[in-house]
Every structure is written in C-alpha cells, then in structure tokens.
Amino acid sequence: LEEKSRIIAIFNTNPEVLELVRDSLQQAGYQAVIAHIDDLKRGRLDMIQFVEEHKPDVIVYDVAPPYDTNWTFLRLMRNSKVMQGRAFVVTTTNKRALEELIGPNDVVELLCKPYDLQQIVDACTAAFEKQTKAKTKTA
C-alpha cells in the first residue's frame, strides 16, 4: 500500500470550529479541507464534486440541531456512491439527544462538544488505521 498524504474533509455549521479543527489536523500532519454543511445542503457547494476533487479518506461531520434533519442528511451523504470506503468521525453538541434519535450503534465515532481538539485528531488517526487494515485484507 503506497503512502500518500492523508486527507480529511471537515463538514461543520460553525466557521470558527471549521478553522480550529482544520488547524489541529494540519498540525498533526494531515491535509484538511473544509466545507460548511449549509452550503452542501442548499446546493451552493456540490458535495460529490467536492469529494471527487479532494478525495478525503476520512470525513469529520458535525450533527447540529435540528438533529433529525442533519442526521438524515449525513445518512444520505454516507450512502452516496462517492462516499463508499470513506471513514466518518461524527461530532455533536448533544450526544444524548442524538443517541435517542439514532441509537448507540449507527455512528463510527461520536464526540461531544465542547470537545478537546486532540480527540478529533485521535479519532481521525484511528479511522485511518481501521481503513488501512480493511484495505490490506481486501488487497
């Protein structure tokens, strides 16, 4: 398996959080690209084109209120063909409310805010390691 730069896409509704998470991931040696979730949902930014252009291995997605519509958008996004084989790290402001909606098993990784940015870096690193093992088994 050739070593290539590890790319992470960050999807969030808060511009400040987008910048903070990007800075933390870049300091950890990752290449990070960002998109505002509202731009994706409203079609101002084409999600498929964004993913095809940047080819992220891991996607950090924040499920913000209203949880039901944002969770539904995440599920639709994850099921699209362009997302196959990509790992997701899911963040939220209210873990209990989200778990009541989806149950505890549907999420790759669920982190709560205010979160330690290192938790996101660690979750992305774990997602890459899981992905590498899966690709090695199928190769």
PLM ranges: what are they?
Residues 52-54, 78-84, 105:
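Conserved phosphotransfer cores of two-component systems
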Residues 69-72, 93-110, 122:
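Alpha4 helix (beta4-alpha4-beta5 surface) of REC/receiver domains from two-component response regulators
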Residues 15-39:
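Two-component/phosphorelay signaling modules centered on CheY-like receiver
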Residues 89-91:
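Hydrophobic/aromatic residues positioned on beta-strands within the core alpha/beta folds
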Residues 115-124:
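C-terminal output helix
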Residues 42-47, 57-79, 95:
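Conserved phosphotransfer microenvironments
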Residues 11-12:
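Conserved acidic carboxylate
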Residues 125-139:
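The C-terminal output helix
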